[in-house]
Amino acid sequence: MTTQLNINSVIENAKRVITPLSPISIFAARNPWEGLEADTFEDVAKWLRDVRDVDIFPNKALIESAVARGELDESVFNQLVTDMLLEHHYNIPQHYINLYIDNIKTLKDVPASYMNHSNVDVVADLLLEKSKRDMAESYHHYDVRPMSDAIIDEQGEPLSEQVNRQMIKWTKLYIDQFLSSWTMPKREQSFYHAWLHLAQHDHSFTKAQRQVIKGLPNDPEMTIESVLTHFSIDQEDYQAYVEGHLLALPGWAGMLYYRSQQHYFEQHLLTDYLAIRLVVEQLLVGDEFKSVAKDCESRSENWFKQTVASWCYYSDMPSDVLLQHDVNEIQTFIHFAATMNKNVFKNLWLIAWEMTYESQLKQKIKAGHESVAGALDVNQVNVSENDNANQPHSVLLNDTQAVDENNSELNQMGTSTKAQIAFCIDVRSEPFRRHIEAAGPFETIGIAGFFGLPIQKDAVDEQFKHDSLPVMVPPAYRIKEFADRYDMNVYRQQQQTMSSMFYTFKLMKNNVMPSLLLPELSGPFLSLSTIVNSIMPRKSRASLQKIKQKWLKKPETKLTIDREFDRTSDLPVGFTEQEQIDFALQALKLMDLTEAFAPFVVLAGHASHSHNNPHHASLECGACGGASSGFNAKLLAMICNRPNVRQGLKQSGVYIPETTVFAVAEHHTSTDTLAWVYVPDTLSSIALDAYESLNDAMPMISEHANRERLDKLPTIGRVNHPVEEAQRFASDWSEVRPEWGLAKNASFIIGRRQLTKGIDLEGRTFLHNYDWRKDKDGTLLNTIISGPALVAQWINLQYYASTVAPHFYGSGNKATQTVTSGVGVMQGNASDLMYGLSWQSVMAADRTMYHSPIRLLVVIQAPDYVVARLLANNEHFARKVSNHWLRLMSVNEEGRFKSWI
């Protein structure tokens, strides 16, 4: 029992190095380093470089591209270098330091000739011995790594590649999601037991190896302990050893991690996986593990060689000249090179890039408000010229106040804003919102797309239930969609007819004899379909939609808003009346919409339309777990239209006029259109006027938004008909880049809309409404930071990781991806399960980046004490800031910006 508890504890702690990977059909953004944020970004970067040779800093090409495009100010970098050197004193001639810095900051690689020089070996051996005697700081410690990583096979590749191939084969068999007609035997017992049963008959193992498998214990924890003992791994190194195996195939391990969280009977799935993997490693390594007992020492020796070569190359000091110095001087030189290694300068380039963006964002906001100040009547501005003379940035807040007051007065008179449209904070809504506001008396609002509703949706047109909220939060309620019984029966029959046709096709394709006949039967139809889809993608897509609407038309549906008893549900179905009032109040507060209601309030979810795109869920709403957010929007709108809810809100101080109506639309991000999801049958006259005004303005809004978006796509030249071109991109099944998604996301602004209204933020900013003056205890701000801001950071770091380390954290080229086991994509048939974003999602061309890999900048419009209180109360967020996983900036009531570093 002690052993079992110890192994389970080791595995539980080792999970930190991977992230749960959901199936591609419900793809949700994940921060690949969420479990490592207790350490600093820099420490994790160093550790990943040591254990997997993965570099998570932007490389030389990305840095040079950023400088060339004006995204990175070299003077900022040079100042950072100067400041760093002033913090330390080195007993080294200044000209050597200058040469070293001037050379290494270019990020040039050290030529192999320097590494192979005999003098470098001599110096490295000398320093290694001295560091062992003195326990010097420069001694570089390496964690123990899997034995199979240290052994090279006859083909010249690490033996771990053979282990990986075995694990990919077995994991694919176990995970398979309804694609194979013949599933893995005994999988219902466990992954480990199914493998034990089958591996005894697997002739890729020798007869002796199969005998070893036959004698393995039935308990996976005992098996793991046995292998670790066999390899003479010290108990304090168990976790590092297990982490090495999880990182070998983080995609497949991540998928198993996800499944272990979803189903009680699979909660020990990672334990099964590791037991199998360690056994396979033991079988393939054999007795060769005895030859790698000094692996850590040899890696340290190699590190010394690299550091010596770096000093000689960057300082322009030949190795024979280095040997002429005494050992203490040599140690000083090498200590300097170790301290000022290339990763340090990559980190400085990254910080300079982020500081440049921060500066450019501040200038945009200031410039935007200076132009507003010029347009405002001087009597509306609440300060005098003399007051501003010594406060150059104070125009920012005062202009915001003036605009706030101006809008509020006009709203109360009923002559200003016709419609208020609440969009998801998604960066793609920023340009669309800007064009809507420019088109008429419309106000836009930013809120997370799940609208504060912690629900699991059960939609009539979806096969499975879906958690429609951020993935880090479990659902608390289930909401069912239903329709009239007769309509529902007809719809179900139509669904069954369609699904039976597809099931028959799949059954024939996956069975030996029928699959031989299938090309003859389906060939003519599929050939015609291929030709039509290729030549006329937009028309064929439209025709298909018309056919679908005719033969599988979704009936008019309602939602289970009120609490219902359902013994089959593990979650409460629907809400009580008080819960409806509470959720409506919370959502309105999060939207900063508790007064001055327009006659027509639209809650706009968002969705993306693309064809033949396995990663379509990555373009959906991240706050809804990789699904469209129209369902949540409809639920909230229906709640807010209820008289009893409005009465309850009135008692809480929120009065919604009787003439105000809530409706629901969906922003289609791939075509920049607004599709109506729910509009009440009865509209007040002023609400109807607002509805018609918005509809009339939409064609022009879509054209402007599409033109702006299409100009950024690399395969587009001059666009004469942007709306038609956008629809073609969304319909074309050969299009690898129907839209950019959330690429180039860089900041998250929490504040009043007037802070950024009219400013072109280039579709790079998440915008969330917030007024600190209405949030006395900071609860709303903490909610925004703990939910929407966290989702934004996960999205940001997934894009970041897929750009800086695409081979490890990306998913490769879309054109060569293979959808595997119904859960994800691979490159070829023997790769890891790729769990990041594709190359086309972050790069414009082979050597031209599109996404700028910088960490998220969170901007809060509030006084310093409000931000300080947030950091004191929210340790999780404070740790992200202090450990450099994101950047934090605030703007106070005087309009002054502050960076919280």
From Swiss-Prot:
Q: Which organism is it from?
A: Staphylococcus aureus (strain USA300 / TCH1516)
Check the UniProt entry and state the signal peptide residues, or none.
none
Q: What is this protein called?
A: Probable inorganic carbon transporter subunit DabA
Q: Which UniProt keywords apply?
A: Cell membrane, Membrane, Metal-binding, Transport, Zinc
Q: Which cofactor does it need?
A: Zn(2+)
Q: Which InterPro entries match?
A: DabA (IPR018752)
Please give the Gene Ontology molecular function terms for this protein: zinc ion binding
PANTHER family of this UniProt entry?
INORGANIC CARBON TRANSPORTER SUBUNIT DABA-RELATED, UPF0753 PROTEIN AQ_863
Q: Which GO terms describe its cellular component?
A: plasma membrane
Q: Write down a Pfam family by its short name.
A: DabA
Q: What's this protein's function?
A: Part of an energy-coupled inorganic carbon pump.
Residue positions binding Zn(2+): C424, D426, H606, C621
Compartment(s) of residence = Cell membrane
Topology versus the membrane = Peripheral membrane protein
What is its quaternary makeup?
Forms a complex with DabB.
Report the family membership: Belongs to the inorganic carbon transporter (TC 9.A.2) DabA family.
Main location per UniProt?
membrane
